[in-house]
Amino acid sequence: MKFNKVKLVIHACVLLFIIISIALIFHRLQTKTHSIDPIHKETKLSDNEKYLVDRNKEKVAPSKLKEVYNSKDPKYKKIDKYLQSSLFNGSVAIYENGKLKMSKGYGYQDFEKGIKNTPNTMFLIGSAQKFSTGLLLKQLEEEHKININDPVSKYLPWFKTSKPIPLKDLMLHQSGLYKYKSSKDYKNLDQAVKAIQKRGIDPKKYKKHMYNDGNYLVLAKVIEEVTGKSYAENYYTKIGDPLKLQHTAFYDEQPFKKYLAKGYAYNSTGLSFLRPNILDQYYGAGNLYMTPTDMGKLITQIQQYKLFSPKITNPLLHEFGTKKYPDEYRYGFYAKPTLNRLNGGFFGQVFTVYYNDKYVVVLALNVKGNNEVRIKHIYNDILKQNKPYNTKGVIVQ
């Protein structure tokens, strides 16, 4: 009997120990959950993702584009020969006087599967997407929904910083915000922008030019806040659909998956695939895929005043060194003395555009390399366009 009592006491103690242990573990888990920074919490589908899922429910893959190339035209024959001899791996599109004159693929879209680049291949345009963000920003200005000189805190009241940051400084990359550091922990644009606000301003860089993806991520969030719509919806309803850019898509749009180029880079063991694993946080600054022909189509339509009036378009495209456009860089692109330029490089893919009133040259590659050397040779040496185009300090009407 005595032995049974001892046994019962031991069992009771063990049971009590188990209950206390479970309670402590539960308490620690609860504390840990509540202490997680909201930036790092897993979220449901973002507004951008919801919009794209709904949009693509009934959408099918776009119609195939045909190769455009006239071997009888000496300059285009020379461009083709040059791209082949330089082992170019990508696609090219060239518009001359608003007409598509060349559209051709070289090398492979997917080396593992042996899928070749064609005019249908869509490339990750990286920072060239800032041009689209700049256009959306400009549209909101012209609609009097924003003032480019207002502080960002007027539109995002929670975006508090040690010094005021006008939207214009974000657009010109002179906000002073610390360089954006992407993280796999950030699952959407909101989390990325909260992280940017949390890091704040580098006093040494305030009001000084420093290229920073973070500036355009914040602008993308401002666009969302002002319109009450996701960045993706703004892009499609204000640019993509009106201008019929049917071979452009965000990184996660299923109907376009088979056309998306994979990016590569050479390392000590050979060619390596660079997986783009942070694009969910890059709305506004680097998660758009385009064919070179669609980018050329976008630019030619802007030149033809299909997005803005001549009064807005001409200064936007040509002025620099003036009060309104003090720098070569504005709204995601450069206006330089001999050309206008867009460029983006992300996860082994490089997307570069040179253009003037006669030619739009778009060169996209998906094996990391120097795209600038090739496009300069095509634009300056073959097409002979190294001549005055924009004049510093001249106000354009």
Swiss-Prot record:
Molecular function terms from GO: hydrolase activity
Record InterPro entries: Bact_CellWall_Synth/Modif (IPR050491), Beta-lactam-related (IPR001466), Beta-lactam/transpept-like (IPR012338)
Signal peptide extent: 1-23
Assigned keywords, A-Z: Antibiotic resistance, Cell membrane, Cell wall biogenesis/degradation, Hydrolase, Membrane, Signal
Enzyme nomenclature, EC number: 3.1.1.103
Primary residence: membrane
Any one of the GO CC terms: plasma membrane
Reaction(s) the record says it catalyses: [(4-D-Ala)-(2-GlcNAc)-Rib-ol-P]n-[Gro-P]m-beta-D-ManNAc-(1->4)-alpha-D-GlcNAc-P-peptidoglycan + n H2O = [(2-GlcNAc)-Rib-ol-P]n-[Gro-P]m-beta-D-ManNAc-(1->4)-alpha-D-GlcNAc-P-peptidoglycan + n D-alanine
Keyword Ion transport listed: no
Induction: Transcription is dose dependently increased by the addition of beta-lactam antibiotics, fosfomycin, and bacitracin.
A Pfam short name: Beta-lactamase
GO process annotations (BP): cell wall organization; response to antibiotic
Top-tier EC class: hydrolase
Miscellaneous comment text of the record: Inactivation of fmtA results in reduction of the methicillin resistance and in a modification of the cell wall structure.
Stated name of the protein: Teichoic acid D-alanine hydrolase
Designated gene of the protein: fmtA
